[in-house]
Amino acid sequence: MTDTNQNSSRRPFHRRRKTCPFSGATAPKIDYKDIKLLQRYISERGKIVPSRITAVSQKKQRELANAIKRARFLGLLPYVIK
């Protein structure tokens, strides 16, 4: 009985909602030539990191994916990292 009282008195874990790093006045522009920026959103294996991990909005995630794919096509980024 006391165990349930202790659980109810504790505040549940509340995760703060992340904001998109590309929204805002001082946010960087997504550009296929900006390799340093694009590499932050690529995993160690060379895959594009999903937006649920990076907190990028859906619209900006599409722009980011297209910029990464364009940079790969032009040879600025590798397709696979060994």
Swiss-Prot record:
It comes from Bartonella tribocorum (strain CIP 105476 / IBS 506). It comes from the Bacteria. HAMAP family: Ribosomal_bS18 (MF_00270). GO terms for biological process: translation. The lineage of its organism: Bacteria, Pseudomonadati, Pseudomonadota, Alphaproteobacteria, Hyphomicrobiales. Pfam families: Ribosomal_S18 (PF01084). Keywords: Ribonucleoprotein, Ribosomal protein, RNA-binding, rRNA-binding. Binds as a heterodimer with protein bS6 to the central domain of the 16S rRNA, where it helps stabilize the platform of the 30S subunit. Coiled coil: none annotated. This is Small ribosomal subunit protein bS18. Part of the 30S ribosomal subunit. Forms a tight heterodimer with protein bS6.
